[in-house]
Swiss-Prot record:
Subcellular localization(s) per the UniProt record: Endoplasmic reticulum membrane; Microsome membrane
Keyword Oxidoreductase: yes
EC number from the UniProt entry: 1.14.-.-
Organism of provenance: Drosophila melanogaster (Fruit fly)
Protein name (database record): Probable cytochrome P450 4d20
Sequence intervals crossing the membrane: none
Length: 510
């Protein structure tokens, strides 16, 4: 009897699985999109979900070698496409309707809720318009002062390991500096992460950005319904960390609202205006103030609305920048001719005083450093893949992508295509100087995405990268010490072996 029941249940399960996949399977077959062998129910999950974040990049690369620039993949009922084909990049990133992020972005939702990174539709359009004011050039000048101040703390903290012999994982130092920058820029508060890394908000944020990406590559934790059962302690830790972060952000918002209320009551409050010469002054918390005085359809943003956007800015402004800066320092350390050319540019543009503050205008004159940053993000894009979810059937060239398919544009491999970047594995910043004359396919290089959903904070990110990199190089010579990179894929590109360099104080500073 039990055997009959089990057999019947299995037949029903297989029939259900076949039925829900049938149309997508037929579409893939019609379009001849290749991929690994899929078994009933599990799909291809057993091939990938045991690899871990440190091995998935290599696995994806092997599949590109085997199947070409695009391959399909199944995990349970999820149909996915991985591609490095620029025709897919152009079609998807240029679309004004294909704006829903891939399924993996759902791991961000418990923390970011419906913030700009994961929202869609009218809400996304309205919030995006508000955010453009936060990156006005006058506001950016104020941010540069914040970046410069916290970068000085970073180089001071590096002194104790700058002996020319010790391999230093730069991500640990850069990440804390970036947290100090983004917390002050986003919320107008100083958490002093570089000297107090155990501050509760900082610990909670670091915990969340470790737990959630790790779930993508563990079958027992991948699904929200299974995660609390498979890892109850980790699940409770995640909920606790998110509560700590939300409580902190709520407290900052509440205190700022009260400050504004008192200013209005005594007649000293003056709303921000982009025509106001003082918008970049040190007295302004530009991002939070702009959100507090913003409205959509004549309705002011609620505390919950503001929190999810501040949290989004915190997430995107910490990990992505930290990855970019750390990988740049790693590459510079291993290319002494590049390092020397940057240093000469810094001396020429910023002057010999390593402690002198920098301005936005000076940073914009660092043309070669700009090329170094671009080349770093070509080889080591902080966001190694961009996801979109096709709710409806999609035509790309002669291919038909079935509805309910997540499509992942793998920047990590597209940026290494020899058709667009000769000698693609070589670190050669000059290729971006040459591109000013030669040009290249717009979608061959998209570290900040492209189209309507491109990164709205990219100018902020590049300025911060320039400030942090230039500050380190003005004080220290970088040396090629420590383990080589072992690229690790999660939301942000990391290295399982650390991002290591050695540091030696510049002669004038010894």
């Amino acid at each position: 009897m039990w055997l009959t029941l089990i057999t019947g249940a299995l037949i029903l399960l297989l029939t259900w699985d076949f039925g829900r996949k049938r149309q997508r399977v037929l579409a893939f077959e019609k379009s001849a999109i290749p991929g690994p062998i899929s078994i009933p129910i599990l799909g291809c999950g057993l091939q990938a979900l045991h690899l871990g974040a440190e091995n998935i990049i290599g696995w994806v690369g092997e599949k590109f070698d085997k199947y070409g620039k695009t391959f399909r993949f199944w995990i349970l009922g999820e149909s996915l496409i991985y591609t490095k084909d620029l025709q897919y990049f152009e079609t998807i990133l240029s679309s004004t309707t294909l704006l829903e992020k891939g399924q993996l972005y759902e791991y961000l939702r418990p923390f970011l809720n419906d913030g700009l990174l994961v929202s869609t539709g009218r809400k996304w359009h309205a919030r995006r318009k508000i955010f453009t004011h936060a990156f006005h050039f006058k506001v950016l000048e104020h941010y540069v002062e914040i970046m410069d101040r916290h970068s000085s703390v970073m180089v001071d903290n590096l002194r104790k390991v700058a002996d020319g012999k010790t391999a230093v994982d730069m991500l640990k130092y850069v990440s804390l500096a970036a947290l100090d920058v983004i917390t002050e820029a986003a919320m107008g508060v100083q958490v002093n992460a570089q000297n107090d890394p155990d501050f509760p908000y900082i610990k909670a944020l670091k915990s969340v950005v470790y737990i959630q990406p790790d779930r993508m590559f563990r079958f027992s934790r991948r699904y929200n319904w299974l995660f609390p059962l498979a890892a109850p302690l980790l699940h409770r830790q995640l909920l606790s960390d998110i509560r700590v972060m939300h409580d902190f952000t709520d407290k900052v918002i509440s205190e700022r609202r009260e400050t504004v209320r008192r200013a209005k009551a005594d007649g000293t409050y003056r709303p921000l205006s982009l025509g106001d010469a003082e918008i970049g002054s040190k007295s302004q918390m530009a991002l939070l103030d702009i959100l507090l005085q913003s409205s959509i359809n004549n309705q002011p943003l609620s505390d919950a609305d503001i929190r999810e956007e501040v949290d989004t800015f915190m997430f995107e402004g910490d990990d992505t920048t930290s990855s970019g800066v750390s990988h740049a320092l790693y590459a510079i350390a291993r290319h002494p001719e590049v390092q020397q050319r940057i240093f000469e540019e810094l001396q020429r543009v910023l002057g010999p005083d390593a402690s002198a503050p920098v301005t936005q205008a000076q940073l914009q004159d660092l043309k070669y450093l700009d090329c170094v940053i671009k080349e770093t993000m070509r080889l080591y894009p902080p966001v190694p893949a961009i996801g979109r979810h096709a709710q409806k059937e999609l035509e790309i060239g002669d291919k038909t992508i079935p509805a309910n398919t997540s499509i992942y544009l793998v920047l990590y491999y597209a940026h290494r295509d020899a058709n667009y970047f000769p000698d693609p594995l070589s670190f050669r910043p000059e290729r971006f100087l040459e591109d000013q004359e030669q040009g290249h396919n717009t979608f061959a290089y998209v570290p900040f995405s492209a189209g309507p959903k491109n990164c709205i904070g990219q100018k902020f990110a590049v300025l911060e990268m320039k400030v942090l990199i230039s500050k380190v190089l003005r004080f220290y010579e970088l040396l090629p010490l420590g383990e080589e990179l072992k690229p690790m894929l999660n939301f942000i590109l990391r290295s399982a072996s650390g991002i290591n360099v050695g540091l030696r104080p510049r002669k004038a500073l010894r």
